[in-house]
């Protein structure tokens, strides 16, 4: 019975294990292994997991053999139970359940130990999970191009091909097709002459160094070194196949050449594919001779690598070409980081495994490399540290291999082109330079020369398709370009991009895929598009911004899949899981069986999709958002009937500027010499060197591609010498426009400049991360100087990510790399793009990457709320800078402000609150040199057609340096993120409208360097009396905002560190860092907070202020001397009369009797009472009433605009000051010097009488303290406890002593700082005086020159006074 039970259990186990699947892998035969048991999917623990277990699993799954058995949740952590652990297969089992294991149960392994497999074959990622059907035949055959023993060049490894296609010699390759030549360049084609410009290096030490020569017009010529730098050299080295550039010597370093000087003033950006694509002077035009010939020193040919004896071109034994032969790599220190670099160099994506031990068999050649130690971020193995070439201590049984997650993209292009003497376009080398190993001709074509051409899209059909899916409206997205179908990378891909694809294919709307969907297998061929950023309104994917054709950082495991809601067409198959994957074996594309689902649109659906030619995607600027409803661009069955127009990207090409709304490129460095009027239906981004005049007028679109509509058109009047910024790199050499310039209503419009693209990098999603801006072909960051909610609102709006999500603290997404493009952004919050905001010039900043802007947005709204193209970043809420106008469905944020006489379409109606009643429009004018004055902009009213003036000196590189009239209601201008002028420092309007340098003397007396935290709103920049000198009218006066300021919560004439709500906003002590110290001082009585209201019951105690000690020291007052150019000092002392000198006995207890409660009337002056709680200047702190120099200052106190103070408020102040007096605090008169004498100690027996330690808000009844003990005397009602123990009393006393010492130290430092300030002010004034004298002398000299020119003799006439003086000869 036991045997039967075991057999039954085994059968049950086998039945359970028969259902396997691989999840979260790059394809159907790689991923995390999951098993079905007890009605649930679970994972397998990696304890004991090895290649033998993976071999069984791959065989059960029908994926062939096993390549790797990664553990540690390599493909991510799974969910559910961990069903199996400690599998111990031999490798030949037919089922995984036959292998010994620890039983079916939920094991204690965590999902961090989930096992995975990488199998040889591939299946569809969405194929049946429990499918176990084997692939038909052996999908992986031998590689082509075996190396002949006598061959000196390496073979070119192609995609998997049948063994019959192997050759014993090098494969002949067609040359790279020439690019479209510019119309100004027509080289004379002689016998054997190249069809395009070629380069060579002569007179150098090797083939990758020497004098650069160019073939043009049937002759070799040189290049002038004017403007020649490393960026130009990098392009030339790359074109020559010589790696990177080491140096760019000029001055005929490699000897003078012969023939013409073909090129001059070359200005490459470094990213061009060929030197001919760089801006330069016309052919043959130069001001150079051969003593200025340019040269090159390149890094040399890079070694090539390949993966041999593997199942396909992206898995196998790693071999390196060196010394004219292939060799292997030793597996010492070989790991995934090294394999990742090799996979990246091969174009095979990332690394799945790095097997050693000759996993793919032993090599036969030399062992080239050993001890490779890559970091993983290198672009090629040659950049990794390793032993010298050929030095090793290994055997071929230690050969390293790699398994990559990508499939070979057609033929693997070698780094060094192969020599092909039969090629008519091979690279010619100097006869003095020996032939280098490896090819020297152009790279092989993208497709095999023997392969039949791929069938392209049918005439009039979209240039894209969905393949490998269950229907024509679901599958992997492929795009037709350059005669080939290619895939699209899923970087930045979202529902808006899918919406454009579904609309173009006539498949309805996109369907939100579940997490496991969206993958329809790996594509083949090139990856054409990456970083697609559609807005959702485009009629075609070609209108969306994206990276250049073929520029990406992806592998085919990132191919985009799209699922639309449209009804499947006639090519639908019945069972979506009835096909199997079969590689193309190098002959044709990889295909699905039965039948190739390459989704050719059926006849019934052809007329439902738009018919338009394809153009270069990714070049339309972000500002060309078509704020129209989706009905405005419905596909039509009418063919456009307009030929495709190509515009050359070469500079200087006489191309007619007739772009349309889809034009995406323009000639570089194009300069118009004559002014002409330009109109455009899109936002034309021009970089002005002179002011522009913007007018707005309604026009009726003449487009015949859709329903006519009334749109608003921005019209610009261009002045001479207006530079149009290039839009970036275009490797294709040409662009396409979908309209004929001759029939375009907007003929003569300049081509829009390059796209101002933004993105959020390194964040958890596309709407959170570090803000980066695309400029000059590079992504760069934005500095956070002056960045606030208004700038973030514009950025979120432009990204289509809704509103700004409030964050607590700062979210870190890591520092960026590359340049810091923008700084000092100054958006108002209503702009539609960051390019419309004022900022510093491109690349001008004072930041590092620790200050990069990070942004978190709420995300775009769903389709159920608004259409996919509308965003409401601020919901119209009034921001600090002004009200932001938000787009709503059916409205357009129009540039025009005039009311159309015709009935506008819903897509072009202005928002109700975008215009003034009179048709006026709000704009802003900057009048500071940097464009960032104290005010971001002063609101001005501009009529349509008027000029928005600005004197902002912006760099020409900035997209929109000038302010633009924005649609929106006028808003109050606010200062630029600086403390507003407070009542203590009321600056004149002139001083508040323009900033001064930080080092100059500000008229308001505010010195930011003296304020610990000037950015807090509650912090004041009060003027220092040491900076004010009598003799000049004061621009800053002290004014109280409310009559209740007499009740400000100060315990002494000095200010608290933070003002109360009734105080003027932003006004605190100029030395705000002492506010916390003052709370521990004897005068502050350890109050809980600054809002404490004095209790009236302490009033009687302040009458004995004469018993408290008085500091007899008079601190140095360097600021009491008169200064000839300073502002009068303001004395804010509340006691203009000299009080009688009190006794200095520190131990004499204070009398508790209330008979002495009335305050002396001479201690407080009613007119100066309001200033007492708001002034904390050192002059008042360091002034003694007995000092003979201070009464002079008392008369200088003025209160301009101060409200009258009634008697009750004055009495309240007196009561407040009296209540703050205690046994350890001086009287109000003595409080002018907060430094008590060293002999003063707070008496222990009287400590508890200073009951203000525990004051709370609100008055309490009076109590007469009893001096006989702390536990029996009546005390104020608010206390920590009913009877304070002696230990607490001693602690309070000790704290007060510490506060005294801290206060003494603080005031010593303050005095030293004031002396330094006075000295600095004196020096500054001396310098100003010297400058003034110099200017005066220059003025006198100029006047003298005007009065008596050098050619005119000095008149001899003298005045009567001069005649009475004795002449020099008479003396």
Curated annotation (Swiss-Prot):
Residues 439-456, 1149-1163 have a biased composition (Pro residues). GO terms for molecular function: extracellular matrix binding; fibronectin binding; laminin binding; scavenger receptor activity. GO terms for biological process: defense response; defense response to Gram-negative bacterium; defense response to Gram-positive bacterium; detection of bacterial lipoprotein; innate immune response; negative regulation of interleukin-8 production; regulation of interleukin-8 production. Residues 143-200, 431-466, 592-756, 888-1270, 1351-1371 are annotated as: Disordered. Disulfide bonds join 45-109, 58-119, 89-99, 224-288, 237-298, 268-278, 330-394, 343-404, 374-384, 489-554, 502-564, 534-544, 783-847, 796-857, 827-837. Residues 665-676 have a biased composition (Basic and acidic residues). GO terms for cellular component: collagen-containing extracellular matrix; cytoplasm; extracellular region; extracellular space; membrane. Detected throughout the gastrointestinal and genitourinary tracts, in serosal salivary gland, the exocrine part of pancreas and testis, as well as in a few tubular structures in kidney. Not detected in lung and heart (at protein level). Strongly expressed in testis, kidney and pancreas, with lower levels detected in bone marrow, spleen, lung, liver, colon, stomach and skeletal muscle. Very low levels or no expression detected in thymus, esophagus, jejunum, ileum, duodenum, ovary, uterus, heart, trachea, brain, cerebellum and bladder. It is found in: Secreted; Cytoplasm. Residues 143-154, 741-755, 936-957, 981-1004, 1018-1035, 1218-1230 have a biased composition (Low complexity). Residues 1-16 form the signal peptide. This is Soluble scavenger receptor cysteine-rich domain-containing protein SSC5D.
């Amino acid at each position: 019975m036991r045997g039967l039970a075991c057999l039954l259990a085994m059968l049950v186990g086998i039945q359970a294990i028969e259902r396997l699947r691989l999840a979260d892998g790059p394809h159907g035969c790689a991923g995390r292994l999951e098993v079905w048991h007890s009605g649930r999917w679970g994972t397998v623990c990696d304890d004991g997991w090895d290649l033998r277990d993976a071999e069984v699993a791959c065989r059960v799954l029908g994926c062939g053999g096993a390549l790797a058995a990664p553990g540690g949740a390599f493909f991510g952590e799974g969910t559910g139970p961990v069903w199996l652990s400690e599998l111990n297969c031999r490798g030949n089992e037919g089922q995984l359940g036959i292998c010994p294991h620890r039983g079916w149960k939920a094991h204690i392994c965590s999902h961090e130990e989930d096992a995975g497999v990488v199998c040889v074959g591939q299946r569809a990622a969405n194929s049946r999970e429990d499918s176990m059907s084997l692939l038909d035949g052996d999908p992986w055959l031998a590689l082509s191009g075996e190396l002949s023993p006598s061959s000196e060049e390496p073979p070119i490894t192609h995609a998997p091909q049948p063994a019959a296609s192997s050759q014993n010699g090098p494969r002949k390759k067609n040359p790279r097709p020439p690019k479209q030549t510019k119309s100004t360049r027509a080289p004379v084609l002689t016998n054997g002459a190249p069809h395009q410009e070629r380069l060579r290096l002569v007179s150098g030490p090797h083939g990758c160094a020497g004098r650069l020569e160019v073939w043009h017009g049937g002759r070799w010529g040189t290049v002038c070194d004017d403007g020649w730098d490393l960026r130009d050299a990098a392009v030339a080295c790359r074109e020559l196949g010589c790696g990177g550039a080491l140096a760019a010597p000029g001055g005929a370093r490699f000897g003078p050449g012969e023939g013409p000087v073909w090129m001059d003033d070359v200005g490459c950006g470094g990213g061009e594919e060929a030197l001919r694509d760089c801006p330069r002077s016309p052919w043959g035009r130069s001001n150079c001779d051969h003593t200025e010939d340019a040269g090159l020193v390149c890094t040399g040919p890079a070694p090539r690598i390949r993966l041999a004896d593997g199942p396909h071109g992206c898995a196998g034994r790693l071999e390196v070409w060196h010394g004219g032969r292939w060799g292997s790599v030793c597996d010492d220190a070989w790991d995934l980081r090294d394999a990742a670099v090799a996979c990246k160099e091969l174009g095979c994506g990332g690394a799945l495994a790095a097997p050693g031990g000759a996993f793919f068999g032993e090599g036969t050649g030399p062992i080239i490399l050993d001890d490779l130690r890559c970091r993983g971020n290198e672009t090629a193995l040659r950049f990794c540290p390793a032993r010298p070439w050929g030095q090793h201590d290994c055997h071929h049984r230690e050969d390293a291999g790699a398994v990559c997650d990508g499939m070979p993209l057609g033929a693997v292009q070698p780094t060094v082109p192969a020599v092909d003497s039969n090629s008519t376009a091979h690279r010619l080398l100097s006869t003095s330079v020996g032939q280098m190993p490896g090819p020297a001709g152009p790279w092989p074509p993208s497709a095999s020369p023997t392969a039949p051409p791929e069938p392209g899209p049918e005439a009039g059909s979209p240039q894209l398709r969905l393949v490998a899916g269950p229907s024509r409206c679901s599958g992997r997205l492929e795009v037709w370009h350059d005669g080939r179908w290619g895939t699209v990378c899923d970087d930045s891909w979202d529902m808006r991009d899918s919406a454009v694809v579904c609309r173009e294919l006539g498949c309805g709307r996109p369907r939100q895929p579940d997490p496991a969907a969206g993958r329809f297998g790996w594509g083949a061929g090139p990856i054409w598009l990456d970083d697609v950023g559609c807005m959702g309104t485009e009629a075609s994917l070609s209108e969306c911004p994206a990276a250049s054709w073929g520029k990406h950082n992806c592998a085919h495991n990132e191919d985009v899949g799209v699922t639309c809601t449209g009804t499947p067409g006639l090519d639908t198959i019945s069972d979506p899981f009835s096909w199997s994957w079969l590689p193309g074996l190098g002959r044709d594309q990889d295909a699905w069986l039965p039948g190739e689902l390459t989704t050719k649109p059926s006849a019934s659906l052809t007329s439902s999709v738009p018919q338009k030619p394809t153009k270069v995607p990714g070049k339309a600027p972000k500002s060309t958002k078509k704020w129209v409803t989706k009905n405005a661009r419905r596909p039509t069955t009418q063919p456009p009937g307009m030929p495709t127009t190509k515009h050359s990207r070469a500079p200087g090409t006489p191309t007619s500027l007739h772009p349309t709304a889809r034009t995406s490129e323009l000639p570089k460095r194009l300069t118009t010499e004559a002014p002409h009027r330009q109109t455009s239906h899109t936002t034309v981004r021009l970089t002005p060197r002179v002011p522009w005049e913007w007018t707005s007028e309604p026009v009726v679109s003449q487009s015949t591609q859709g329903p006519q509509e009334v749109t608003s058109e921005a019209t610009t009047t261009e002045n001479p010498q207006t530079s149009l910024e290039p839009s970036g790199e275009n490797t294709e050499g040409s662009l396409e426009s979908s309209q004929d310039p001759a029939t375009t209503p907007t003929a003569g419009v300049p081509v829009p400049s390059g796209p101002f693209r933004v993105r959020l990098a390194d964040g958890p999603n596309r709407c959170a991360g570090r803000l980066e801006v695309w400029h000059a072909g590079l992504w760069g960051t934005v500095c956070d100087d002056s960045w606030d909610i208004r700038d973030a609102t514009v950025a979120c709006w432009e990204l289509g990510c809704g509103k700004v999500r409030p964050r607590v603290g700062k979210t870190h997404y890591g520092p960026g790399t590359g340049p810091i493009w923008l700084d000092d952004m100054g958006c108002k919050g209503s702009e539609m793009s960051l390019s419309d905001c004022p900022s510093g010039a491109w690349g001008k900043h004072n930041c590092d990457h620790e200050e990069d802007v990070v942004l978190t947005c709420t995300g775009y709204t769903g389709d159920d709320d608004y259409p996919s193209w509308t965003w409401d970043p601020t919901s119209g809420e009034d921001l600090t800078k002004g009200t932001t106008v938000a787009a709503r469905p059916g409205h357009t944020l129009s540039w025009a402000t005039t009311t159309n006489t015709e009935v506008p379409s819903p897509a072009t109606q202005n928002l109700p609150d975008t215009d003034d009643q009179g048709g006026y429009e709000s704009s802003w004018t900057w009048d500071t040199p940097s464009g960032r004055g104290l005010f971001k902009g002063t609101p001005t009213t501009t009529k349509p057609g008027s000029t928005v003036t600005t004197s902002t000196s912006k760099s020409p590189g900035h997209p929109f340096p000038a302010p633009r009239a924005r649609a929106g209601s006028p808003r109050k201008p606010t200062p630029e993120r600086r403390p507003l002028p407070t009542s203590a420092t009321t600056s004149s309007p002139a001083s508040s409208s323009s900033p001064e340098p930080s080092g100059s003397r500000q008229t308001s007396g505010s010195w930011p360097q003296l304020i610990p935290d000037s950015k807090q709103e509650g912090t004041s920049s009060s003027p220092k009396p040491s900076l004010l000198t009598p003799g000049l009218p004061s621009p800053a006066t002290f004014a109280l905002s409310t009559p209740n300021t007499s009740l400000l919560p100060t315990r002494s004439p000095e200010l608290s560190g933070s003002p109360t709500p009734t105080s003027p906003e932003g006004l605190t002590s100029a030395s705000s860092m002492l506010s916390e110290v003052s709370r521990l001082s004897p005068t502050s009585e350890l109050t809980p907070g600054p809002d404490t209201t004095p209790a009236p019951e302490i009033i009687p105690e302040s009458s004995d202020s004469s018993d408290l000690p008085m500091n007899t020291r008079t601190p140095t007052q360097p600021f009491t001397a008169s200064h000839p150019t300073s502002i009068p000092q303001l004395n804010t002392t509340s006691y203009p009369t000299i009080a009688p000198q009190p006794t200095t006995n520190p131990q004499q207890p204070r009398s508790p009797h209330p008979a002495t409660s009335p305050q002396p009337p001479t201690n407080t002056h009613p007119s100066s009472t309001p200033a007492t709680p708001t002034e904390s200047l050192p002059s008042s702190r360091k002034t003694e009433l007995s000092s003979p120099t201070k009464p002079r200052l008392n008369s200088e106190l003025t209160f301009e605009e101060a409200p009258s103070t009634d008697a009750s408020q004055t009495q309240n102040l007196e009561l407040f000051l009296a209540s703050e007096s205690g046994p350890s605090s001086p009287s109000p008169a003595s409080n002018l010097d907060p430094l008590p004498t060293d002999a003063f100690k707070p008496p222990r027996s009287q400590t508890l009488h200073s009951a203000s330690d525990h004051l709370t808000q609100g008055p309490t009844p009076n109590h007469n303290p009893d001096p006989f003990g702390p536990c029996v005397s009546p005390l104020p009602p608010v206390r920590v406890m009913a009877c304070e123990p002696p230990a607490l009393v001693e602690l309070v006393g000790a704290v007060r002593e510490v506060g005294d010492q801290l206060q003494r130290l603080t005031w010593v430092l303050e005095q030293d700082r004031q002396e330094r300030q006075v000295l600095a002010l004196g020096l500054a004034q001396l310098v100003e005086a010297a400058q003034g004298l110099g200017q005066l002398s220059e003025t006198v000299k100029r006047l003298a020159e005007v009065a008596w020119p050098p050619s005119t003799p000095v008149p001899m006439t003298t005045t009567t006074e001069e005649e009475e003086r004795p002449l020099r000869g008479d003396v």
